[in-house]
Amino acid sequence: MVKEAILYEKLSNNKVRCTACARYCELKEEQIGLCGIRGNQNGKLDLFVYGKVIAGHVDPIEKKPVTHYYPGSKIYSIATTGCNWLCKYCQNYDISQRRKIEGTDMTPEEVVQTAVDTGADGIAYTYNEPSIFIEFARDCGVVAHQKNLFNIFVSNGYDTPGSVKMMGEFLDTITVDFKGSAEPEFIRKFIGVPDPQPIFDTLLEIRDKTKIHVEITDLIVPQVGDSLEYAEKLCRFVYDEFGDRKSVV
């Protein structure tokens, strides 16, 4: 179903600015954002994939990967179509880059009941970037908490203060998955993102403004995204901003 988004601003001349991710797409009437699932219809921003689940699987939590939050638990993983990144090597390309709105119609209550029926301990919003369908994820997440399930995002971290604030309403854990250690040239050439800085800003926003458990991964792409220099910079950032230096000898 189509539902009006929450994370957006109205501009002049019936234009809108999406604030779900750091692209901040400004859209005229009938224009669709880069993600392919949020668009301007009659001067309001609609989410075209609300309740459209393109994939649903039960996974071990470690597959997300999440390794320090309820290890050994089972997760019901869901996704919609679309993504705000254009990774040329994407493993889930058929989902993330699909430009046709498809999927099984499911209400938040049905998503959660499916998770319960499969014996899952929580729900992961994954396979594509969940921040672009965050309004649907939030509604699922609220119901999930009522059923004593936890919620996980597997995210590229290219988010905004507004999306982080909404995450804080329902999210228990987030894995922010860096690509190529956020080397700027790699990010621009292979992902279509002009600047990786919003990822770092998102992590600090989550740390400072929420109680969400954070895990960080880094996808190394051999030959094109394997800079040792930027891997060291990323490690230094994690150590300086998230490390418990008192425990380091």
Show which residues each predicted segment covers.
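Short pre-active-site segment immediately N-terminal to redox-active cysteine/selenocysteine motifs
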Residues: 79-82, 86
